[in-house]
Amino acid sequence: PRAVVAGHGDFAAGILSAVQQITGLADRFVPLSNTGLSPAGLEDAFRQLLRESGARIVFTDLPAGSCTMAARRIAKTDPELVVVTGVALPTLLAFACGSDVSDAVESGRKALQLVEGPRGA
């Protein structure tokens, strides 16, 4: 695996299911849910997954969420760990297909669009 995808509830498993359906490349990621984990337990789970998988990149769902906070604590002592937060499907698709992390993040940014509908909706 190239990266860990972490988030609340079934976020990681769900978004990786979409990556698999579209590209067949979900095996490039390891999912992690924060469900039932304390902050310390979440950090321990991250450390174990990173150690076992060799992944050096973490994608998380929310900038101030527990998964991001745990990953950032680890990154303070591991300068090679890259944390990307606010992840969306286009970002993971680009990364799975071989883009480096910076290009994958840019793909996610470019994909985010406001499609105008009725005002006030």
Briefly describe each language-model feature range.
Residues 1-121:
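N-terminal loops that bind phosphate or other acidic moieties
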